[in-house]
Amino acid sequence: FSKEVTVNVVRPGKTGADEIKQMMTNFRNNPPKELGGSKVVLWKDFLKLEALHEDGSKTKLDMPATSNVLQWFCNDGTKVSVRPSGTEPKIKFYLEVKGDMKNASEYDALEAKGMEKVNAIKKGLRLD
């Protein structure tokens, strides 16, 4: 089971652009250690082309320079990607949560549990 939710945080005007820039700086300098109760084990910064591992080691991302994107990966498969929009006054969060589904009858329960996790992540990142 996998569920992805996009959260758009709109901050119009010059002050909004400054706020979005500051949010990215804060996330880059102080990345979350947990998301919705799950431990973050890998942090990727596609602007710096750098990955920070749970043990504190850093590795370079072997790819061409890309964009101002951060990704956080948890021990349970949860993933959060964050990036400012290039064309609109907003910052976008892509939240992905996972669960083991053995048969279709478990879907509704996993969907509800997935949304609980998404809401916990949003609360932890102060996106509500």
Per-range role (PLM):
Residues 83-108:
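Intrinsically disordered, low-complexity regulatory segments enriched in Ser/Thr/Pro
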Residues 1-83, 101-104, 114-118, 122-128:
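Phosphate-binding and adjacent anionic-ligand microenvironments
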